[in-house]
A protein has these predicted regions:
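N-terminal glycine-rich phosphate-binding loop and ensuing alpha1 helix
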Residues: 1-40, 45
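N-proximal accessory regions
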Residues: 1-18, 58, 81, 99, ...
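Conserved core of the sugar-phosphate nucleotidyltransferase
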Residues: 94-190, 205, 227-230
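Short, charged, surface-exposed loops that flank catalytic or proteolytic processing sites
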Residues: 150-155, 212-221
Length: 230
């Protein structure tokens, strides 16, 4: 709710429901997530988000407004998570099958680490916004105890991996891994998150066009729609 670039974006409508509702309803079908938790800032203006989660039967944790590392750590501790799967609340088109794939990959690793298909990682080819990050609770706890930089407290992934520069923070401490995007939707040019008014207009049009035909529209449907825009 407190986004500086697009205030109130979590409640902006997509095909008649708030953006955050659309994010959550697309996560629910993921088979490899034991429990979905909406981690929100503990402030009066964000209580409406709890009502949306309640509508979908999803648990809520309210924590620090600005310290996301603390919010995630406290939520993971309360819900006794061995692994944390992070899906940003401004990505309205997550694909549950790709979330399941990155979780399966991560659970097969022999040591704690950070895995992501949330966006392109090391040339994986993923569109920005259909996957997830997963990391071990032990690494989140280490970050919670030792990270003091404000930017890293506000952006959890920067404790592990910098997407913009494709640079791991410390491979000796936290191995970084990904999976290859299936070739039929390997489109790293697609940005499917909502951070600006222009991106919201794009996503609103996408939902208006695709959701009534198929509420479970896939990334292949998105690509076909996107490529026919012009």
């Amino acid at each position: 709710m407190g986004s500086t670039r697009l205030p109130g974006k979590s409640l902006m409508p997509l095909a008649g429901k708030p953006l955050v509702y659309r994010v959550l309803e697309r996560i629910i079908p993921a088979r490899n997530i034991d429990q979905v938790v909406l981690a929100i800032p503990d402030s009066a203006e964000n209580r409406v988000l709890s009502e949306i989660a309640d509508e979908l039967g999803i648990a809520v944790f309210a924590g620090s407004e600005d310290d996301l590392v603390d919010r995630y750590y406290e939520a993971a501790k309360i819900f006794q998570a061995d692994y944390v799967v992070r899906i940003p609340a401004d990505n309205p088109t997550p694909q549950s099958s790709e979330i399941d794939r990155i979780i399966e990959h991560h659970l097969g690793l022999s040591i704690p680490g950070f895995s992501s298909n949330l966006a392109e990682v090391f040339g994986s080819g993923y569109p920005d916004g259909i996957g997830a990050e997963i990391f071990d609770f032990s690494l989140l706890k280490d970050s919670w105890q030792s990270t003091y930089e404000q930017t890293k407290r506000e952006h959890v992934h920067l404790n592990f991996f910098d997407y913009s520069r494709q640079i791991p923070v410390d491979l000796n401490w936290c191995p970084i891994s990904t999976i290859d995007c299936p070739t039929d939707f390997a489109r790293p040019d697609l940005i499917l998150d909502v951070n600006t008014a222009e991106q919201y207009r794009y996503m609103s049009t996408l939902y208006d066009d695709l959701y009534p035909k198929n509420p479970n529209f896939s990334i292949l449907d998105i690509i076909a729609w996107h490529d026919n825009l012009n």
